[in-house]
Amino acid sequence: MVRSDENSLGLIGSMSLQGGGVVGKIKTTATTGPTRRALSTINKNITEAPSYPYAVNKRSVSERDGICNKPPVHRPVTRKFAAQLADHKPHIRDEETKKPDSVSSEEPETIIIDVDESDKEGGDSNEPMFVQHTEAMLEEIEQMEKEIEMEDADKEEEPVIDIDACDKNNPLAAVEYIHDMHTFYKNFEKLSCVPPNYMDNQQDLNERMRGILIDWLIEVHYKFELMEETLYLTINVIDRFLAVHQIVRKKLQLVGVTALLLACKYEEVSVPVVDDLILISDKAYSRREVLDMEKLMANTLQFNFSLPTPYVFMKRFLKAAQSDKKLEILSFFMIELCLVEYEMLEYLPSKLAASAIYTAQCTLKGFEEWSKTCEFHTGYNEKQLLACARKMVAFHHKAGTGKLTGVHRKYNTSKFCHAARTEPAGFLI
């Protein structure tokens, strides 16, 4: 059997595979017979084959040196073996020039993983269970943080509603200057406030007596069917007068009746007659005493009855809260509970009104709610109202107990939708 000249060792040098790399050297002879195929054809078939890839071996330097010291494997390059190398897209590294093939830089590198090395590492590529649990927990935390950020973004993007848009054609709403009016109220509301400890200057009175008087006046106001503004102005006149004038205990009810008369003259269209006020006082005072006290109180207050009370803020803030009838009634129930309590004098009228609406919203909905529109128009955020709201919830809890139950009985009627029976928002405390 004739052996092909192209497989002669005189034509093709040894091929060595070191570290997965293929290194070939082609040697031509000077003498070539006329019957033999041109060596250029064979060399062309070998040298023009696709470039061999570099074999990346994941071994340390010492291990690579050990492999390089192994004797090379000699194998003749047949056409079949050359075709296999061509299918694997090999890369030729020229040992003579020591320069990489320019085409090889565009080919993706092939990574060869040593089986022996995998066996040394244990042969198990699965990660420990605690690592998987940690990654799951981290993913869950990241998901929760994304949800919180989305919720915060939704809150930040919540638009402020134009609450006066529906009243632009209503001349009584005074849309053109309603904002200026309430800005004025906010700037001057401190003038309507009294020191929260003014009762210390009264030698014959205490805060419990004040509470009894106001609780009784709330019932009188309800029986006479007077306007809501009248009640708030009456209590404001009483506190401002007692803060600057000493009074004896037996004249306290006279101060209350006279303050109601002054408020009615300022707010009401039809004013109760003096005799009716004397009658509800069980005729404890004469007509002359009522008129004399009226002069004294008006002069002491310098006839100043145009100060903002919680009522003017309540109407505006309820509009900002887009309230319904139920929320409105419950809000007034909350703030009237505060009128009886002496300790609530420390809060500004606007803050009392905002806290009452906030507490009523939480009571009805069962969770904390304070919209951007409410925050914009009231000037108070949820955190600023929380302390006052907690006190209102405490008053709500005890509204039906004790001796001062006038507000509870008033709002436990069908006229006020039995608002006093509403379950208090205990989660705020």
From Swiss-Prot:
Regions that span the bilayer: none
GO biological process: cell division; mitotic cell cycle phase transition
Region spans: Disordered: 86-109
Disulfide bonds: none
Keywords assigned by UniProt, alphabetized: Cell cycle, Cell division, Cyclin
Molecular function GO labels: cyclin-dependent protein serine/threonine kinase regulator activity
Domain of life per record: Eukaryota
Ranges of biased composition (kind: Basic and acidic residues): 86-101
Cross-referenced InterPro entries: Cyclin (IPR039361), Cyclin-like_dom (IPR013763), Cyclin-like_sf (IPR036915), Cyclin_A/B-like (IPR046965), Cyclin_C-dom (IPR004367), Cyclin_N (IPR006671), Cyclins_cyclin-box (IPR048258)
Family: Belongs to the cyclin family. Cyclin AB subfamily.
Name under which the protein is recorded: Cyclin-B2-3
Gene: CYCB2-3
